[in-house]
A protein has these predicted regions:
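Sec-dependent bacterial lipoprotein signal peptides
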Residues: 1-20
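Cystatin/cathelin-like cysteine-protease inhibitor module
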Residues: 20-129
Length: 129
């Protein structure tokens, strides 16, 4: 009985630590992605992130639509270099809320959803909420 309790506690602790690591990895990926793809003169400060969550509800048509929509935002660089290849069956997503200070010095609060591969190595698409 004691072994079962110890095993359960160890397993739970491992899941919590893995989850925290993935959350941090996803947040870092989003920050790096925006630092690379915001137009020059825009500065962002992050306020909050939601929990990292899996989804299987995004298809290639929706990905293309999101990419096209975001390309027309004045604070985002055009021609973002997204990963090529087939879309994974399951994507991970996280919402980020941040303040964007543009060239005019005016703050704008933005909330966007970022879709990533399961390994959390690349942003597949993102959208304005």
């Amino acid at each position: 009985m004691m072994k079962k309790i110890l095993f359960s506690i160890t397993l739970g602790l491992m899941l919590v630590l893995t989850s925290c690591g993935d959350q941090h990895k996803a947040q870092s990926l989003v920050k790096d992605f925006l630092n690379e793809n915001l137009e020059e003169g825009n500065d962002c400060s992050f306020e909050r992130f939601t929990q990292l969550t899996p989804t299987a509800m995004i298809d290639m048509g929706r990905v293309k639509s999101m990419r096209n929509d975001m390309e027309h935002q004045p604070y985002i660089k055009s021609n973002i270099n997204y990963p090529e290849g087939a879309l994974p069956d399951t994507l991970m997503y996280i919402r980020a809320t941040y303040k964007l200070k543009g060239k005019t010095g005016k703050d704008e609060e933005l909330t966007q959803t970022f879709y990533m591969d399961k390994a959390l190595t690349k942003v597949i698409a993102f959208k304005q909420n």
